[in-house]
Regions:
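Active-site-adjacent structural elements that line small-molecule/cofactor binding pockets in enzymes
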Residues: 1-178
Length: 178
């Protein structure tokens, strides 16, 4: 899968000479273009931001199609996921507010003629202090909210070096796998 996020730091866009304010609309167009390039021998595409004249990529990806997962949680991102996304890396917890965001995304998918249950959701659980009870409660909450995938975030857990992070991920997997 390909993860797509439009970013929040305007300085990154300024450094590239790009307009920060249209980054979302540009990314929507880019996703349409990518999907055409991945699936067609030759593409003719004219959008607001991009134009491709009788070109293609070779070799094309073996996997058809590459799932595109979006990150974020702003209203426009939620709409983008419902209309274009194959999955979502939400930036919230699976509480009542998070469940409202998921319901909103699913409605946008229905409105776009898509199956909302075909859009994956990856719940992210902080490693925290390494408490399996907390992880399992969080995993159950994400399951109830409709998450199709889970990940653990080991950042800011006081771990040192790759080996400790890898061991933390193993511990998490064992704890929630039962």
């Amino acid at each position: 899968r390909l993860g797509v996020g439009i970013g929040w730091n305007h300085v990154e866009y300024e450094a590239l000479g790009e307009n920060f304010s249209n980054r979302g609309r540009r990314s929507e167009e880019q996703v349409k273009l990518l999907r055409e390039l991945w699936t067609k021998d030759v593409v003719d595409f004219t959008g607001r931001y991009h134009r491709v004249n009788h070109a293609g990529i070779n070799p094309r990806p073996i996997q058809q199609t590459i799932p595109i997962w979006f990150g974020g949680g702003a209203d426009r991102v939620v709409r983008r996921i419902g209309e274009q996304g194959d999955g979502w890396f939400p930036q919230f917890q699976p509480d009542s507010e998070g469940q409202e965001r998921i319901a909103m995304m699913r409605q946008f998918a229905k409105d776009a003629g898509r199956d909302p249950m075909a859009i994956g959701i990856e719940g992210r659980i902080p490693f925290g202090d390494g408490d399996p009870d907390i992880w399992n409660k969080a995993a159950a909450a994400w399951d109830e909210a409709g998450a199709t995938h889970l990940s653990v975030n080991t950042m800011r857990a006081g771990l040192q070096g790759p080996d400790q992070h890898i061991e933390a991920i193993r511990k998490f997997k064992e704890a929630i796998s039962g």
